[in-house]
Structures are given as C-alpha cells and as structure tokens.
Design a protein with these regions (language model features):
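Glycine/threonine-rich flexible loop motifs
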Residues: 21-30
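A short helix->loop->beta-strand "cap" motif at the edges of active sites that frequently abuts
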Residues: 35-42
Length: 168
C-alpha cells in the first residue's frame, strides 16, 4: 500500500487478503470501518473465518496457498469485463507500450531464459522504440504486442473454472 492508512476511509471498496486486520492491525482497521460506514464494500479473502471476516460484506474462504490464482482470476475478470479506468491505464501505466518481437511466454517461461545460468536475458522483453528513442505506444490498445494485450492473453488462462478448481 502506498497511501496513508487514513486515506482508506475514502475507498469505495476494500479487499483484504490473508490478513486478520481487525485483530492484528486495529488502528488501520478503524479506517477500513470508516470506509464501510460511508458505503464501501469490504471483502475478506482468507482460508479462516475471523473477526475481520465477520465485519466484511463478503468472506471468500480459499484453499491455503491459492491466493495468487484468485488474484489472477480477478485480473482476468477486470480485463475481460473492461472494469478498469481506461484513462488511468492509458496515461499512467505502460499498458499502451509496444513490446518487441522477441518477447514470448511459453511453457511457463518467458523468452530469453538460459537454463545453464538459470537467468533471463531481459533484452528480449524490450519495448519497440520510435525514431526519437522513446517506447512506441498504441493508445488504441489494438496492437497485439502492446503490454495491455499481452497481459490480457497471459491472464486469460485464469478462467472462473480454472480458478475455482484451484482455490476450492
């Protein structure tokens, strides 16, 4: 988290994963409850029902160790349903940057992997550059190699069925 705890009171939704904030971080949880008092939706993702779960609108009891699959499913849903703030994505992230032709992701490994050194040649992931040396951008997000579309393709494997099979 990069904001001050007090700023949580301004949230529309709060997602708590793997923390019993009500018991272990009561001062921080005070600000979460202020957000709820103002209408925010509180979600708690944790295998164990706790005092935090009891105060939230939703408790999602995952199988232990599957939170990354759950988050991947959330990312996929947000991307597929276009539930993101497009102006923010275009102007404040690298989503529109076009990745070079050497980039690939196959069999669980990114391009540039050297099994002998067990390390990556990160130059394989470089952005395409324009004549001025700056990364090329596709603000339409239609280029199949822009970061946004590569991310959509990567997270598409986190379907509702796959995620629910893994997380329980």
């Amino acid at each position: 988290m990069t904001n001050h705890w007090i700023d949580i009171k301004n949230a529309d939704a709060v997602l708590i994963i793997g923390s019993n904030a009500a018991e272990h971080h009561p001062v921080a949880f005070k600000w979460i409850m202020r957000a709820k008092d103002k209408g925010a939706v509180l979600m708690h993702v944790d295998p164990k029902f706790s005092r935090t779960s009891a105060r939230c609108d939703f408790h999602v009891p995952l199988r232990s160790g599957t939170d990354i699959a759950f988050l991947g499913g959330m990312v996929n849903y947000i991307l597929q349903s276009e539930s993101y703030f497009k102006d923010y994505v275009l102007n404040y992230t690298n989503a529109a940057f076009v990745v070079g032709k050497d980039y690939a992701f196959e069999d669980g490994l990114f391009s540039g992997y050297d099994p002998k050194t067990r390390s990556y040649d990160r130059s394989k992931w470089a952005f395409e550059k324009g004549p001025d040396g700056a990364p090329l951008r596709d603000v339409s997000l239609r280029n199949e190699r822009c970061v946004f579309n590569l991310m959509k393709r990567h997270y598409s494997r986190y379907s509702l069925k796959n995620v629910s099979d893994v997380t329980g």
